[in-house]
């Protein structure tokens, strides 16, 4: 095809007359037309060659702009902080664990849950978003500052925001880490704690009244489901701690377990010497004290309780009581019953017996104290040796004291109680003690059944 030189209409290559305007095309015109077509084609090719590079360059620029914005959406400091903020706001513990974990400290989902709760309660979501974005902006604009902290209402550091190199040579790579503190427990008794930490089962053994670390934790309000084992059994419950109640480097842990403490009350035991009472709970024995709480014991098992104590050196036992699980409380009072009539009958008998030889014991102490003081003043052990039971510790220590010429004075005791068991006499009285104070003293004497031939076996204050 070619063009008519007059009207520009289309003509076949061999056609000599234009079908549109009737113009006769000569060979000369044909040659001109061919040259014109070639020139137009050449001009078009030159234009095309000039336009294509610009088009490619424009396309590359557009592509780079698109790539930049895509990278910015996912890798800019603002985008990085948005991932953190969204994880906290949406309770996405898995994502938050990934963001906060470092090579030296793995954050599990339990910690992430506690962290989210703490941020929302102690920082506030709006404040958290504002503070994180402010720290990001300041770090971006600073050439020297490398890190900053987001804090809770009480001033506790909860998040460290820091620069950590660059991403794609363009954006600051931001690092988000949560500071850690050591959680410590101080049990009242030896205990072993088992709980989940770092997605693994952890076991911590703690000694009675000693501070023991259970691990390092990021800021949070924690409630760890825990099994505790003690000599009294196994307990289910929680270990609780909150960074609001933390120290500089540690957090005190409180315990909340299904524990029952037993408080024993005695009935029919007015004549029992309370200092001699022993309380038996299951297979363990404890010293008795009024209002004393004994335990803890698991609320999941029945508990058997009994007691025994002395009246006039004779041991009496209470009836045994079983406390069912349904009746076990945090503080469970248990009343133990002694046979009051039996005890009173025995006490009356012993007091009558005591009165029968009280004069003999009183006379013995009058002679003994005089002899003891004379022996010390004259440094002559023979003056008192006949009043002492030979080869006893008391005999040897008295002999040593007399021979040392140590100043000494012993006062005759005012007898308050005499208890006879076989040929042994237990005497309690009030006298001047070695420290110069007036108070209770105890003697153990040995003699025959009628309180004759008495000898001192033991003395204590």
Curated annotation (Swiss-Prot):
<dbReference type="InterPro" id="IPR054529">
    <property type="entry name" value="TcaA_2nd"/>
</dbReference>
<comment type="similarity">
    <text>Belongs to the TcaA family.</text>
</comment>
<dbReference type="InterPro" id="IPR054530">
    <property type="entry name" value="TcaA_4th"/>
</dbReference>
<keyword id="KW-0046">Antibiotic resistance</keyword>
<dbReference type="Pfam" id="PF22819">
    <property type="entry name" value="TcaA_5th"/>
</dbReference>
<keyword id="KW-0862">Zinc</keyword>
<keyword id="KW-0479">Metal-binding</keyword>
<dbReference type="GO" id="GO:0005886">
    <property type="term" value="C:plasma membrane"/>
</dbReference>
<keyword id="KW-0812">Transmembrane</keyword>
<keyword id="KW-1133">Transmembrane helix</keyword>
<feature type="transmembrane region" description="Helical">
    <location>
        <begin position="51"/>
        <end position="71"/>
    </location>
</feature>
<keyword id="KW-0863">Zinc-finger</keyword>
<dbReference type="Pfam" id="PF22820">
    <property type="entry name" value="TcaA_3rd_4th"/>
</dbReference>
<dbReference type="GO" id="GO:0046677">
    <property type="term" value="P:response to antibiotic"/>
</dbReference>
<feature type="zinc finger region" description="C4-type">
    <location>
        <begin position="4"/>
        <end position="21"/>
    </location>
</feature>
<feature type="topological domain" description="Extracellular">
    <location>
        <begin position="72"/>
        <end position="461"/>
    </location>
</feature>
<dbReference type="InterPro" id="IPR023599">
    <property type="entry name" value="Mem_prot_TcaA"/>
</dbReference>
<comment type="function">
    <text>Plays a major role in decreasing resistance to glycopeptide antibiotics.</text>
</comment>
<dbReference type="Pfam" id="PF22813">
    <property type="entry name" value="TcaA_2nd"/>
</dbReference>
<keyword id="KW-1003">Cell membrane</keyword>
<protein>
    <recommendedName>
        <fullName>Membrane-associated protein TcaA</fullName>
    </recommendedName>
</protein>
<dbReference type="GO" id="GO:0008270">
    <property type="term" value="F:zinc ion binding"/>
</dbReference>
<feature type="topological domain" description="Cytoplasmic">
    <location>
        <begin position="1"/>
        <end position="50"/>
    </location>
</feature>
<keyword id="KW-0472">Membrane</keyword>
